[in-house]
Amino acid sequence: MSQSTNQIIAIVPAAGIGSRMGAEVPKQYLALNEQTILGHTLDCLLNHPQIAQVIVALNPEDKHFCLLPQAQHKKLLTVTGGNERADSVLAALQQADENSWVLVHDAARPCLSHLDIDKLIASTSTFPQGAILGAPVRDTMKRTGEHGEISNTVCRDRLWHALTPQYFQAKQLKVNLRAALAAGAKVTDEASAMEWAGVMPGIVSGRADNIKVTHPDDLQLASLFLKNLGR
């Protein structure tokens, strides 16, 4: 399933409100190094030479996106997202060429590098079924009981943190994501929908600084990483 002759489209589900940040605006619009988190994310995707289009799924009540300098970019298209990430991704897939390949990337991962995108795109020679960026688990992992006590230590061999982008053939992802949701499957990312359908995606080792801004402390870290990337 080669993508060499088909265009590559980036999908950014950005309809969430990011309540864990405790901010007055959705977290993707928080200021970060003289622009917004989402602005940094979009710059990376829009400026990549192999990405033909970027589709952003927005909350229907969104009043912030139109103020971004990236909002009028010729490669950018917006759609109305849904209540859950999977709903937003499906809405974006409805507008994507079914023959394309899609890179689905979290709005709140502003430190993505072009090098990681290149590695993921190139991975189809090894993983024609699609792949995701990941980072090997480095710390000792513990599972707890219902009261917070440690119940056991989890073996971290071959254990990975799932990152984004996640890279799949558009039609296959749309079919499997829709079927998984209809079956009531728990879909936490695109790879989980593919796994549910019996497709086992590959994992490509990505940079550790490709963090997701989830808590207030993450902003400081993301700022440092972006400066190191020259952004």
UniProtKB/Swiss-Prot annotation:
The record marks R156, K212 as: Positions MEP for the nucleophilic attack. It catalyses: 2-C-methyl-D-erythritol 4-phosphate + CTP + H(+) = 4-CDP-2-C-methyl-D-erythritol + diphosphate. It holds the Pfam family IspD. Its EC number is 2.7.7.60. The keyword Transferase applies. The record marks R20, K27 as: Transition state stabilizer. CDD domains: CDP-ME_synthetase (cd02516). It is an enzyme of class 2 (transferase). It comes from the Bacteria. Coiled coil: none annotated. PROSITE patterns: ISPD. GO terms for molecular function: 2-C-methyl-D-erythritol 4-phosphate cytidylyltransferase activity. GO terms for biological process: isopentenyl diphosphate biosynthetic process, methylerythritol 4-phosphate pathway. Pathway: Isoprenoid biosynthesis; isopentenyl diphosphate biosynthesis via DXP pathway; isopentenyl diphosphate from 1-deoxy-D-xylulose 5-phosphate: step 2/6. InterPro entries: IspD, IspD/TarI, IspD/TarI_cytidylyltransf_bact, ISPD_synthase_CS, Nucleotide-diphossugar_trans. Transmembrane segments: none annotated. Keywords: Isoprene biosynthesis, Nucleotidyltransferase, Transferase. Belongs to the IspD/TarI cytidylyltransferase family. IspD subfamily. Catalyzes the formation of 4-diphosphocytidyl-2-C-methyl-D-erythritol from CTP and 2-C-methyl-D-erythritol 4-phosphate (MEP). PANTHER family: 2-C-METHYL-D-ERYTHRITOL 4-PHOSPHATE CYTIDYLYLTRANSFERASE, CHLOROPLASTIC (PTHR32125:SF4). This is 2-C-methyl-D-erythritol 4-phosphate cytidylyltransferase. It comes from Shewanella piezotolerans (strain WP3 / JCM 13877). The gene is ispD.
